[in-house]
Every structure is written in C-alpha cells, then in structure tokens.
Regions:
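Conserved acetyl-CoA-binding loop-helix of GNAT-fold acetyltransferases
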Residues: 101, 106-121
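Short amphipathic alpha-helix that is part of the acyltransferase structural core
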Residues: 2-50, 62-66, 73, 95, ...
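Conserved beta-strand-loop-alpha-helix junction that forms the acyl-donor binding cleft
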Residues: 118, 128-144
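A short helix-loop-beta-strand connector motif used in the catalytic cores of GNAT acetyltransferases and
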Residues: 49-64, 126, 153
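Acetyl-CoA-dependent GNAT
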Residues: 56-60, 67-88, 97
C-alpha cells in the first residue's frame, strides 16, 4: 500500500513558516512546470528562494506544509507585503502567491489546511492581492469556491499579458502592436 496515496490525517501535517532549511524544497515545489494557454511555464527561484522573493516582497511570509511521516514538504504559499500605489500614496499591501501542492498529495485537503493558516495569520490589511491563471482550474477551484476554507474571494477582472517569443522583423512587431 502506497502511503502517499492514502488519506492524510491532519495530525500528520504541520503548517509552519518556512525557514532557510526549507529553501531547496521550496525551489523544487515552485519549479514544477504548469501549462497555461498551451504554453508550459516553470518558475525558478535559483539560487535561493528567499533571495528571489526580495523582488516581490518587502515583508515576507513563506509557509510550508510538511508531512511529518515522510518529512516531505508537500505544499507552500507566500503571503507577504509589497509596496503599491493607492490614491497616489505608497502603501503596503499583501500579495499571495507561489501556492503549490505536490502532485502526489493533491486531493488530500491540503488547501483546507492552508486556508486555516491563511485565516489565522491574515492581519491588516486583512486581504491579499493574487493572480491566478485563467485556465488554472485547480487553483481557481481551491481559491474561488470557498469550499476549502480560504477567505472570501473577490474577482477584480482579467489581466491579459502579451508575450513576444521571437523578435522577428520590425515590420511584423509593429503590425502586431
């Protein structure tokens, strides 16, 4: 019997703030490729997950879920603060990102465990911005439905980002724009 595929009891999972000792496991979770609009994307945080997050966050909160039986880091997310302009003033707003669940642990209510942690640690401002790929149905179901115990989700609209994959000729690029 494969222990990874059996239901997990809450008491085998620890949700805690990530430490430098978790750096390699965090980079492995983040690097798993995902597909959106037919393009495979892989996020890299080399050589250090924590150093790379300096670009996104001024104040960091990186969280891992560890399976105490296997001592494996099975999920993670970040919910730190970053500066944003609001009504012509710079204010710190929370930005939630890097939500990842190890493929072999999906469907084991890990997002519910994370939801409890988010609610417990969400301080002023008690909301977070986040970006979810439109076709990332697993993340959308986990975050948007309320079934997982995550805080209420409010859709602020669709962000469309264009990507230039080849410089081509100037005429083609100008025509595209």
């Amino acid at each position: 019997m494969n222990k990874i595929n059996t239901p997990l009891a809450d008491n085998t999972l620890i949700t805690r703030e990530a430490t430098l000792a978790d750096d390699e496991a965090l980079r492995e979770l983040i690097a798993v490729p995902m597909t959106t609009k037919g393009i495979q994307i892989s996020f890299q945080r080399e050589p250090s997950y924590f150093k790379a997050s300096d670009i996104v966050y001024r104040h960091k909160l990186h969280v891992v879920i560890e399976d105490t039986e296997s001592q494996k880091k099975v999920a993670c997310y970040s919910n730190g603060y970053r500066p944003c302009y609001i009504n012509r003033n710079i204010q710190n707003l929370r930005y939630a990102g890097d939500l990842r669940v190890d493929h072999s642990y999906r469907g084991k209510s890990l997002v519910k465990v994370l939801g409890k942690h988010v609610k417990r640690t969400m301080h002023e401002p008690n909301y977070s911005q986040m970006i979810i790929f439109d076709d990332n149905h697993a993340a959308r179901a986990a975050i948007q439905t309320g079934k997982t115990g995550m805080p209420d989700y409010y859709d602020e609209g669709l962000i469309e980002t264009l990507s230039l994959t080849s410089t081509g000729t100037k005429r083609k690029i100008t025509a595209f724009l």
